């Protein structure tokens, strides 16, 4: 099972983003699953873009519903607490804590993360996630 992180999903949904076609192609035919936190991050980013590039939250939600018909994957409360403990013990901070949540969710559900964000590597490795990094 493959699950895109925000660095793949945002360009896949937004034609104005560099890498749009590449991200769409990477997801095509793979029946990707959606991590709940990635859905929130993606909706947040795309709905606060500059005028002309911005997408309405309802438009993003509709795209997510269409592209990810299966139930989203998430951590239960106990696993979220364990994730934060592991992330803090690994020395992660700031935005890397969100990367840790995404990675832990993928690991918990047996998914491989599809990412274009090599900056998240430390967090993904600290959480023990399998990651497929996009080329380019």
Where are the regions a protein language model picked out?
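Short, well-structured N-terminal submotif of metal-dependent ribonuclease cores
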Residues: 1-35, 50-59
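A generic structural signal for short hydrophobic patches within well-formed alpha-helices
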Residues: 9, 39, 120-121
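Short, structured coil segments at secondary-structure junctions
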Residues: 28, 68, 126-127
């Amino acid at each position: 099972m493959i699950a895109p992180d925000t660095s793949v999903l945002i360009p896949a949904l937004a034609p104005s983003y560099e890498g749009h076609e590449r991200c769409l192609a990477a997801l095509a035919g793979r029946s990707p699953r959606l991590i709940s936190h990635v859905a929130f991050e993606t909706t947040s980013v795309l709905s606060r873009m500059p005028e002309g590039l911005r997408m309405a939250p309802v438009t993003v939600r509709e795209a997510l519903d269409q592209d990810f018909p299966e139930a989203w994957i998430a951590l239960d409360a106990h696993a979220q607490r364990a994730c934060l403990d592991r992330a803090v013990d690994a020395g992660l901070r700031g935005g890397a804590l969100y990367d840790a949540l995404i990675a832990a969710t993928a690991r918990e559900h047996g998914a491989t993360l599809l990412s274009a964000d090599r900056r998240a590597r430390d967090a993904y490795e600290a959480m023990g996630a399998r990651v497929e990094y996009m080329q380019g």
